[in-house]
Amino acid sequence: MSETRATRIGLGVWVALVLAFLYVPIVVICLYAFNPSNIQSWPIGGLTTKWFSPAIHNPDMQQALWLSLKAAALATLVALVLGSAASFGVHRFRFFGRESISFLLVLPIALPGIITGMALNSYFVFWKFNFGLWTIVIGHATFCVVVVYNNVVARLRRMPASLTEASMDLGADGWQTFRYVTFPSIATALVSGGLLAFALSFDEVIVTTFTAGAQNTLPIWIFGQIRLGQQLPQVNVVVFLVLAVTIVPVALAQRLTRESGILRTE
């Protein structure tokens, strides 16, 4: 056996082990959603869908899911606006403290979630904010802005300045240049940044614990049910459905974008 072939096989085995490490627990949870018993034991004693209806019609789960979707959507919207605006400002203009501002923009995602959560909680209490949807959105936006900013600023750095200059030389105004040149170039970065921001917000637990007050988002509801050992079959169903739904935006993003990283406008 040649060294090249041995290396290829070794790398293949290593990749298979890594993928198994990442996805086998997810597959097991998905199988537990069809477990006829309310006790999580392996192997499962058959397949059933009897837990799906109770899980879907659970009012506490529905309320938590709706709150998570609203918070994630609003946090993503805030992140897209602020993150893209910040990336344009940092990339296009030269000013004193530019690198420091860039560092401060990406710092929140590097901080431990418990630090961010405690800081936000103290701030909200000091200013007598009512804990609820908007405090959750503010908390999630602190790290969602980072992923949008990183994606967009990285794409802007790879975008040749000559494209914008050529557009202006051909008589296009600022809006036309943005619409036909800049936006198609950064569209995939916005899509990927928005999807990642939504995913991070949707499954956030630590920061949400400090900013949600008495309300439960879906991850907090799941954590509470697992910690108390209640409704585990329904929790497994909810986890399975969430995993299934998350495939949709990823597939749409792949369909709407192209390998070149440029979104077609025609």
Predicted regions: what they are:
Residues 24-59, 211-213, 266:
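Short membrane-interfacial helix/loop motifs at transmembrane-helix boundaries
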Residues 13-14, 19-26, 117, 149-152, ...:
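Transmembrane alpha-helices
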Residues 29-40, 148, 189-223:
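Non-cytoplasmic
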Residues 2-14, 153-164, 168, 174-183, ...:
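C-terminal transmembrane helix and the adjacent membrane-cytosol boundary/short C-terminal tail
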Residues 62, 66, 70-82, 86, ...:
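Hydrophobic alpha-helical transmembrane segments of multipass integral membrane proteins
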Residues 1-8, 73-105, 118, 122, ...:
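Transmembrane-helix boundary motif in ABC transporter permease subunits
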Residues 3-7, 37, 52-60, 208-259:
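Interhelical loop and adjacent transmembrane-helix boundary motif
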